[in-house]
């Protein structure tokens, strides 16, 4: 998993409440057995005027010129500012995969759906909860200043606005540790690889019949 330490990026606004996971990545794209390739279908039903199916060439489709991420001023955005209850709906982990693979590193909103919130951390995305008044201020500044960028310093737990003012935010210490070090669940487990190997060796030496039973099954 990619580390998150300090990130500076262009900000895009998603001015809708209750954006659910089916809007983030529609159900027809969940058929893939791979974990990659979802970025091109992020917000598919809003992003394109035609219906999308897995395997379609995005270049052959009709983009919706009114959708925010299709507007030239937000091309290459890596920070998304959203409204309350972002990521509600089903618990599909494909939603943070799609956001990450599109290029987003952080999402700022007044609130998130719980499962989506946790899935973001597990996939290298930083979801930040901010007061609604702060989110309103950011929406206003994004609209007023083309090319609006923010700097997010996870170690210091601050968001730095273009003028230099800092917005503090909270993050659970364990989640912060994982993002700073790039640890997903597998990475956390592999930190103890030596102990796991030692345990398996001891078990094989003291209870060899268990290994034999497993092989027979």
Curated annotation (Swiss-Prot):
Class of enzymatic activity (EC top level): lyase
Reaction catalysis annotation: (2R,3S)-3-isopropylmalate = (2S)-2-isopropylmalate
GO terms (BP aspect): L-leucine biosynthetic process
Signal peptide interval: none
Record keywords: Amino-acid biosynthesis, Branched-chain amino acid biosynthesis, Leucine biosynthesis, Lyase
Alphabetical list of InterPro entries matching this protein: 3-IsopropMal_deHydase_ssu, Aconitase/3IPM_dehydase_swvl, AconitaseA/IPMdHydase_ssu_swvl, IPMI_Swivel, LeuD
EC number assigned by the record: 4.2.1.33
Molecular-function GO terms, alphabetical: 3-isopropylmalate dehydratase activity
Pathway: Amino-acid biosynthesis; L-leucine biosynthesis; L-leucine from 3-methyl-2-oxobutanoate: step 2/4
SUPFAM superfamilies found in the cross-reference section: LeuD/IlvD-like
GO cellular component: 3-isopropylmalate dehydratase complex
Protein family: Belongs to the LeuD family. LeuD type 1 subfamily.
Subunit structure: Heterodimer of LeuC and LeuD.
Record NCBIfam families: leuD (TIGR00171), PRK01641.1 (NF002458)
Function (record text): Catalyzes the isomerization between 2-isopropylmalate and 3-isopropylmalate, via the formation of 2-isopropylmaleate.
Protein name as it appears in the record: 3-isopropylmalate dehydratase small subunit
Organism for this UniProt entry: Delftia acidovorans (strain DSM 14801 / SPH-1)
Phylogenetic classification of the source organism: Bacteria, Pseudomonadati, Pseudomonadota, Betaproteobacteria, Burkholderiales
Gene that this sequence comes from: leuD
